[in-house]
Design a protein with these regions (language model features):
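Membrane-embedded alpha-helical bundles of multi-pass transporters/translocases
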Residues: 2-336
Length: 336
């Protein structure tokens, strides 16, 4: 009976396959996270010749997540279509990101160097549009889980699948691109690398829409049965319409919400910096002198050491709650 979709006791429960498939939306967004946030700064500097502007724009846009996330969340809350509340945002977000990647990595380099002002403008606009699509999908991941299940006993299981989905999307791209990029290196007559494959748009502009399409399809299958109005309210209750002014009032006066927004934006910014290819090239290539030999082993070790923390944090959350788990393991991470 634990795999039934809903119960008469008012608790909304998900089937196992739904818990497994829906977090693949997180994996889908992480494919783009690696593709854009890890490589766009280097691409903007080496191919578009935008210098530090590319890195600066990426950093500023991550800070702006604290503003765009609640706005799109409010828009999602007021949306209800014949195709559901969440699926339209997933599909639209995926299309926006796919088009943005193609425009950024394939079309934008076609703008001649004599029109550098146009490159700056188009780079900013395209990247901003990509951020909107990215926020569409990440907001679905957070909001959709409340529709999928409100059973406290299923939340730890959802957390496990969500983490696996996130690691699949990010890990596959982080592992695959360095292996493939050697085929796109431009060498001189002596065999030395003149242009790194990381600076070649062909490396990732084709494989990403395919990967994201598969991930979104599986995600839609996971939530399709639950993306209906009777699951939008707690226990299937009818929701009241919330005015936009009420959202602003909550943001203005709710101090815990403000802290959450700042913390969320800060975590995203830190992750974007830590996984940026420019930073990793400086660390493993310049400081340690051997990027190709060090990057993949260090990345794999990072995932290996993350697994015990993940399992322990889930266990602590089940016993003492998510707040206690977060405080404990963030403290351990800071000490380490």
């Amino acid at each position: 009976m634990s795999n039934t979709t809903a119960k008469n006791d008012g608790v909304n429960r998900a089937k196992l396959y739904q818990l497994a498939l829906f977090p693949l939306n997180n994996g889908a967004t992480n494919v783009y996270f690696v593709l854009i946030l890890s490589y766009v700064a280097q691409f903007g500097s080496s191919i578009l010749q935008l210098g530090l502007y590319a890195s600066l724009m990426v950093t500023i846009m991550r800070i702006c997540d604290a503003i765009t996330d609640p706005i799109i969340g409010a828009l999602m809350d007021r949306t209800s279509t014949r195709w559901g509340k969440f699926r339209p945002f997933m599909v639209i977000g995926s299309v926006i990101m796919a088009i943005s990647v193609i425009c950024l990595y394939i079309l934008l380099p076609l703008v001649p160097e004599t029109m550098m002002a146009m490159r700056y403008i188009l780079f900013t606009l395209i990247y901003f549009v990509w951020v909107i699509g990215y926020t569409f999908q990440t907001s679905v991941t957070r909001a959709g889980q409340t529709v999928l299940t409100n059973d406290p006993n299923q939340r730890p299981m959802f957390t496990i699948f969500n983490t696996i989905g996130s690691m699949l999307g990010m890990g596959v791209m982080q592992f695959l691109i360095p292996l493939i990029k050697n085929a796109y290196n431009i060498l001189d007559e002596s065999g030395a690398v003149v242009v790194s494959g990381y600076a070649r748009p062909e490396l990732y502009a084709i494989i990403t829409p395919i990967g994201i399409g598969v991930s979104v399809l599986l995600t839609i299958l996971g939530i399709a049965e639950k993306d209906r109005p009777e699951y939008y309210g707690i226990g299937g209750s009818k929701q009241e319409k919330v005015k936009l002014s009420e959202y602003m009032e909550i943001i203005r006066n709710n101090k815990p919400m403000k802290r959450l927004m700042v913390a969320g934006a800060g975590c995203k910014l830190a992750l974007a910096i830590a996984t940026n290819t420019t930073v990793l090239l400086a660390l493993y290539g310049i400081l340690m002198g051997n990027y190709d030999s060090l990057y993949l082993p260090m990345m794999i070790l990072g995932y290996v050491f993350a697994v015990p923390f993940f399992l322990l944090s889930v266990r602590t959350s089940q016993k003492k709650g998510q707040k206690a788990s977060l405080q404990k393991y963030v403290g351990i991470a800071l000490v380490c």
